Amino acid sequence: GLLYDYAMLAEKANKMDVMETALRKIIRLAPDNQHAYNALGYSFADRNIHLQEALALIEKASKIAPEDPFIMDSMGWVQFRLGRLQEAENYLRRAYAIRPDVEIGVHLGEVLWVKGQRAEAQQFWRDANQKDPQSDLLKSTLTRLRAQL
């Protein structure tokens, strides 16, 4: 809906407090909206803050839509942030099998890279690069990890 779109625009403008307020309002008004739970939880996980709340939010989203690959991606990412590398890999592999999306592939690549599975990580990143050579997420991940394709 409109409030969710507003929250996503606020995120793009880096107005995280506005995004958080809007998503919490959606959750209050529509407690079965998995997208709001997932977006808020992922936002926290991505910024590496409020990780326990992020996990709880993403778990709620997952109960509503257990086969949603984007929610699986978020669950994998919060598990990664919590240092649970094997759980992260499992969720991200399931998500990627359902939807081989650029963002999911970049996340899976990072988890594999951190686990020392660098050749496989690079393969996921090469696949992501083929799908979207302009991916800011891929570029920033490679730079941050000092990795190459």
Q: Model regions: which residues?
A:
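Terminal, low-structured helical/coil segments at or just beyond the last alpha-helical repeat
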Residues: 49, 102, 107, 113-114, ...
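Amphipathic alpha-helical repeat scaffolds of TPR domains
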Residues: 1, 34-43
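Residue-level recognition of tetratricopeptide repeat
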Residues: 8, 33, 42-43, 68, 77, 101-102, 110, 135, ...
